[in-house]
A protein has these predicted regions:
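C-terminal alpha-helical "lid/dimerization" subdomain adjacent to the S-adenosyl-L-methionine
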Residues: 279-325, 330-332
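A short SAM/SAH-binding and catalytic strip from SAM-dependent methyltransferases
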Residues: 245-259
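Core SAM-dependent methyltransferase catalytic element
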Residues: 325-348
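Conserved Class I S-adenosyl-L-methionine-dependent methyltransferase catalytic core
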Residues: 24-28, 36, 76-177
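A short acidic, Gly/Pro-enriched loop at the edge of an enzyme's catalytic core
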Residues: 236-247
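Helix-to-beta-strand junctions that scaffold the AdoMet/dcAdoMet cofactor pocket
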Residues: 224, 256-257, 270-271
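A short glycine-rich, Lys/Arg-flanked "PGG" loop and its adjoining helix->strand segment in the class I
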Residues: 260-272
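Class I SAM-dependent methyltransferase SAM/SAH-binding core
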Residues: 180, 190-235
Length: 348
């Protein structure tokens, strides 16, 4: 039996514990207020209005929404310290707008709120999963679209943090290499790479058909069809051998039906000196790691992943997968955002 260290968190008096739990309850409503503000463009319209803000009726008109519920949203957003209200006009703080709306920044959290709220729409089946241990299997198309919004932050992390940790990879991408993105979703990482490194040759593999359709449409709209090819398929042993210089999993390895098979198949695709890179958010190694905001978020995501048959892992558990697939021990690179890069490279 594996024993985990306990951090023995400080006991709270009853009144403090009550306040702590009430804060969790209000956090549920705050998440919904944020998601609605993002989806309906309320934060975007307030940001466009600048420091002067908008009247509540003006906000409803600008967002093409109904006045009474938008006014109620303003009350909830003000109560949650998301907007300011001087009695006549509502405005949004620039930093709040940046965090919730700017998708190309590592601080972007709008996708996290979209994912969390959207995932919770399936939780009418969560109690049954806990009783039986039988995952629900496939999630809805809306869930996969929310995952794409969630991973917008991952793309920013890759460009700002991962590439900074691997300057030799930047040089290779500039010169032009063959790259494959495994479980590419809607293809946003591929498009970002294509724009930044126009000599790179890119392939995206994705089994979920709704995501394949969105990725294909996005590539066509962006005029990147000569640089990016999307394939509707799973990651398996039938993938081309010795055809790529970089194989990339972005928040995706844990979703594979058999991660060991996926890693082995991916390794076979690489040419000499080729890299296999996994970017993800790993579970803490012990209980101490859960006593933080990051630990709380990862623990919640881990439960959601188990719900449909996926599994987040610690860095050590990832290393076990690599060994089981016959790969060398990956180098684990912790990033400032708390994400982790796992990197393995073929010999020359």
């Amino acid at each position: 039996m594996t024993h985990r260290a306990c951090d023995n968190r400080r006991a709270m008096p009853l009144d403090d514990r009550f306040d702590d739990l009430v804060a969790s309850l209000t956090g549920f409503y705050r998440a919904w207020v944020i998601q609605l503000g993002i989806e309906l463009g309320l934060f975007a319209r307030l940001r466009e209005a600048g420091p002067a803000g908008l009247t509540r009726d003006g906000l409803a008109v600008a967002a093409n929404a109904a006045a009474e519920p938008v006014s109620a949203w303003c009350d909830a957003a003000y109560a949650a310290d998301l907007v300011a209200d001087d009695g006549s006009h509502v405005s949004v703080d620039p930093d709040v707008a940046t965090i919730l709306l700017e998708k190309d920044r590592t601080e972007y959290l709008g996708g996290q709120f979209t994912y969390t709220v959207t995932a919770s729409l399936d939780y009418d089946r969560m109690a049954e999963y806990l009783r039986t241990g039988v995952p629900v299997g496939l999630r809805s198309a809306r869930y996969h679209r929310a995952i794409e919004e969630l991973t917008r932050q991952d793309i920013a992390v890759f460009f700002e943090e991962a590439l900074a940790a691997m300057p030799d990879l930047v040089a290779d991408l500039v010169q032009g290499i063959d790259v494959i993105d495994l479980h590419c979703g809607g293809g946003r990482w591929l498009a970002a790479i294509a724009r930044r490194f126009p000599k790179a040759r890119l392939v995206g593999v994705e089994p979920e058909l709704d995501s394949v359709a969105r990725a294909t449409q996005m590539v066509q709209r962006a005029g990147l069809g000569s640089q990016i090819r999307i394939e509707a398929r799973e990651v398996d042993e039938d993938l081309s051998v010795g055809s790529f210089d970089l194989a990339y999993f972005q928040h995706a390895l844990h979703e594979m039906p058999d991660p060991v098979v996926a890693l082995h198949a991916t390794w076979r695709m690489l040419r000499p000196r080729g890299r296999l890179i996994v970017l993800g958010w790993c579970l803490p190694d012990g209980l101490d790691g859960y006593a933080s905001l990051h630990g709380q978020l990862v623990a919640g995501v881990a439960l959601d992943e188990l719900f449909h048959g996926a599994r987040l892992r610690t860095v050590a558990q990832h290393a076990e997968l690599f060994r089981a697939a016959g790969l060398p021990e990956p180098e684990a690179i912790p990033l400032p955002s708390d994400a982790t890069l796992l990197v393995a490279r073929r010999d020359a």
